């Protein structure tokens, strides 16, 4: 009989560090966001904010797209929104842009918006409840899904 190898306990100095859970990360991310309900998100967009739909293509095809949103899937988000990155979208003009991130249910968008804030994009936030809440509120959705924007030329890691 063999004994399973145990993983080393993460330490900070002499103290053991309990690894964070995904719920801990979500609470921390949301603590720095001025999250918007769908109606407030629409008002923000009408006032100049940029709405980003980070849902994967299969979800957009199944449910439709948010009218007027830029489609940037989650794995490209930071590169597209960082105004210093050669792979940025045209809307990424400076660090003062208000980015409103929308995923399907409002979970990954919170983590994504916090990541944008870590890049110095302090006005980044997300939609409470995501696309599901947007659609339930009767806000504009396009069907069938429109094609994604082509990616700008430039390097991408």
Regions found by a protein language model. Give the residues of each.
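Rhodanese-like catalytic fold shared by cysteine-dependent sulfurtransferases
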Residues: 1-50, 57-99, 107-157
């Amino acid at each position: 009989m063999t004994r399973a190898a145990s993983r080393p306990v993460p330490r900070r100095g002499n103290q053991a560090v309990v690894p964070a859970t995904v719920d801990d990360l979500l609470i921390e991310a949301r603590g720095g966001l001025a999250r918007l309900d769908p109606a407030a998100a629409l008002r923000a967009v009408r006032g100049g904010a940029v709405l980003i739909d980070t849902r994967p293509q299969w979800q957009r095809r199944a449910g439709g797209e948010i009218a007027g949103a830029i489609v940037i899937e989650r794995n490209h988000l930071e590169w597209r929104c960082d105004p210093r990155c050669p792979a940025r979208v045209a809307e990424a003009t400076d660090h003062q842009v208000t980015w409103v991130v929308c995923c399907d249910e409002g979970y990954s968008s919170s983590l994504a918006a916090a990541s944008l804030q870590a890049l110095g994009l302090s006005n980044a936030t997300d939609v409470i409840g995501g696309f599901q809440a947007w659609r339930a509120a009767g806000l504009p959705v396009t069907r069938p899904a429109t094609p994604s924007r082509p990616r700008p030329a430039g390097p991408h890691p």
